[in-house]
Amino acid sequence: MKIRTLSGSVLEPPSAVRATPGTSMLKLEPGGSTIPKIPFIRPSFPGPAELAEDFVQIAQANWYTNFGPNERRFARALRDYLGPHLHVATLANGTLALLAALHVSFGAGTRDRYLLMPSFTFVGVAQAALWTGYRPWFIDIDANTWQPCVHSARAVIERFRDRIAGILLANVFGVGNPQISVWEELAAEWELPIVLDSAAGFGSTYADGERLGGRGACEIFSFHATKPFAVGEGGALVSRDPRLVEHAYKFQNFGLVQTRESIQLGMNGKLSEISAAIGLRQLVGLDRRLASRRKVLECYRTGMADAGVRFQDNANVASLCFASACCTSADHKAAVLGSLRRHAIEARDYYNPPQHRHPYFVTNAELVESTDLAVTADICSRIVSLPVHDHMAPDDVARVVAAVQEAEVRGE
C-alpha cells in the first residue's frame, strides 16, 4: 500500500527499529539473577526521526487540525484499506467514534429506552450509551465464541421490544463475530438499528473473509496506543452509508456546515494532523505486522495444546490486541496468572469485571437492565489474556508457553 507525505514522497515501511518502551527487569529471588519483563502490551510506533519529519511538514503547512491534508489523506487511506464501498470519518479517539455512531444511528435519547449490549466488554460501551441518552440492557454471551448471544438478545426483544432502541454489538477483543449475519437478520426482523463496536479490530476479518468495518449501520475502531493499529489517540466510524458518515463529520464539529451554522447537536471530536500523519505511517506494512501477531497465536495454540486452555474462535484472522484463552476452572486461571507473574510475564483477565460488576453500575443499578448472565460470569472466572506483540521474539513466546504449561503441570 503506497502512501504519500505532504511533500509528495512515498512513505517507506517503518524503520527496522521502531519506538518501543524500555525494558524492565524482575529479580527472581534475593541475590538471584534477573530476567527482562515481558510486557502485556508493547506499543509499536514510527521512530523519532520519522515523527519529527512529519511534524516539520505540519508546521510548515501551519495546519494542525480541522480536517487538514493529513486527515483527509488518512481517511482516504483507511477507506482504501477497508474497501472502496465504505465511507470513513476519522475522530479524535475511539470513544468519540462510538458516541458519534450512537448519535447518528439512534438519535438523541432521553434515557427512557435501552440499547442491548454484552456485559462482557469494555466499560466504556455502557458509558457511551448513557452519554447519548440510552440505558444499557446487558445480555449474555455465547459459551463457545464469547461473543454476544443472539438467543439472549431475542428473548429480551420478544418481551420488551417497545423499550429497545437498538443493538450495540461488540466484536469482543476485536475478533469478528462468526454470527454477524444472524445478528443483522435479527435486527432487520425487529427493525432495530445495529452498531458494532470493533474497537480493537482494525485489520481483523469476519469468518467469510470480509474485513471488519462494513456491517450493521456502522462500525467503529479505536486507534489507541494499546491497539494493534495505533496512532496514540484516534478512532474512526465506518459505514456503507455516506449520509451517516457525513452526519458523523458534522457531529464531531459542533454540527457546523460550510456556512459556519450549526444544524445538529455536536461536539469537538476532530483528529489532529500529527495523529493522522502517524496513522499514515502505521498503515505501511500493517498486514505484515498483523501476520506476525497471528503467528504468535499459532505458536500459543500449538504449544499449549495440552495445557488445558482454549483460545477464542475466529481469533486466527483477528488483529490480536492480545490472545485470550479460557482455563478449565477459576483455580486453574489463578495458577496460570501466578505462573506468568513468577516468569516476569504481564497478563490480564479481560473483561473481568464485566460491565455490570463495575462499582458505578452496581451503585446505580436503576440505570440498567440485565438478562441472566451465567455464561458471562463463568467465562470471567476462567479467562486469561496473554501478551502479543508485533514480531514478538521467539524466546518471549516460548517463555509464555512454558509458564502456562508449568501451571498445568504443577496443578496449583
UniProtKB/Swiss-Prot annotation:
Single GO biological process annotation from the record: polysaccharide biosynthetic process
DNA damage in keyword set: no
N6-(pyridoxal phosphate)lysine: residues bearing it: 227
Sorted UniProt keywords: Pyridoxal phosphate
Inducing factors: Transcriptionally repressed by IdeR and iron. Induced during infection of human THP-1 macrophages.
Signal peptide, first to last residue: none
Highest rank taxon of the organism: Bacteria
Keyword 4Fe-4S: no
InterPro entries, A to Z: DegT/StrS_aminotransferase, PyrdxlP-dep_Trfase, PyrdxlP-dep_Trfase_major
Single GO MF annotation: pyridoxal phosphate binding
GO cellular component: a single term: extracellular region
S-S bridge residues: none
Stated family: Belongs to the DegT/DnrJ/EryC1 family.
PANTHER family: PROTEIN RV3402C (PTHR30244:SF9), TRANSAMINASE (PTHR30244)
Protein's recorded name: Protein Rv3402c
Record lineage: Bacteria, Bacillati, Actinomycetota, Actinomycetes, Mycobacteriales
